[in-house]
Amino acid sequence: MMKIKIIFSYDGSAFLGSATQPHKKGVQDALSGALSHLGIFSPLLMASRTDKGVHASYAVASVECGDYFTNLEYLQKQLNKFSHPFIHIKKIEKVKDDFEVRFDVKSREYRYIFSHASYSPFMASYVHFYPKFDLGKANELLGFFVGKKDLKFFCKSGGDNKTTLREIFIARAYAYKDFSIFHFKANGFLRGQIRLSVASVLKVLEGKMSEKELKEQIEAKKQYNHFLAPPNGLYLSRICY
C-alpha cells in the first residue's frame, strides 16, 4: 500500500458541502465514489471543510491505495473520468506514510469574489454581485484582522476546534477587471470565519456598523454582527504544507 495526495478543484454549487453527507451529496462522497470505480476503497481524508455553496480552486485530500498504481498521471486521467464535471483532479503525488493531510497544513488561503457587473444568473452561483465600494477603505478595515487574534465572535457554532485563536497572515482587498477580491491567509480558519469577516467589513462600508464596533468584535469584546456573507463568492484557493 502507498499513500497519495490528491490536489483538486470543485464547483461547490453542486454539493451540500465538502464533508461527507447523509445523502451522499458532499464533495468527499463524490470523490470517494470516483475512487471506488478504480478499486480504491480506503477512507478519503480532506485537508479542509467548506460549507454548502463554497468552491475550491485548490483543495487537497489523501487516501491509501495499492502500490501497483505506479503511473500517477494515468491514475489522475482515469479519476477525472469519474469526477467530472463538478470535480477536477489537478495533480496526484505520492507522499510519506506519516503524512497528515489536515494536521500537517502550515497555512490556508481563501478568496472572496465580488462582481460589480450587471447581474447574470449564469454567474450567480460563483460570485457575490455587489455595488462598487471604496477598495482603499476595505483594505484598511481588513488590516484590523491581521495578527494573532481570538476570533470567537467570527465563527459559527458546530465546529470541532479546540481554540478560537488564529493567526491571520494576510487580509487584503484588490481589484481585477469588474471584480473586487478579498484575500485571506492564515494558519487556520474557524467555521464561517471568512463569511462573518466579509459581512462585518461590508456593514462598516455601508455605514451600518462603526470601525470601533468592528475592532471590538475582532478584539473579542462584543459581537455586533451575526450575519454571514453569501457562500457563493467564497473560494478555497491554496493549502500549503
UniProtKB/Swiss-Prot annotation:
Entry keyword set: Isomerase, tRNA processing
CDD domains per record: PseudoU_synth_EcTruA
UniProt keyword annotation of Isomerase present: yes
SUPFAM superfamilies: Pseudouridine synthase (SSF55120)
Class of the enzyme per the UniProt entry, highest EC level: isomerase
PANTHER family: PSEUDOURIDYLATE SYNTHASE, TRNA PSEUDOURIDINE SYNTHASE-LIKE 1
Protein name: tRNA pseudouridine synthase A
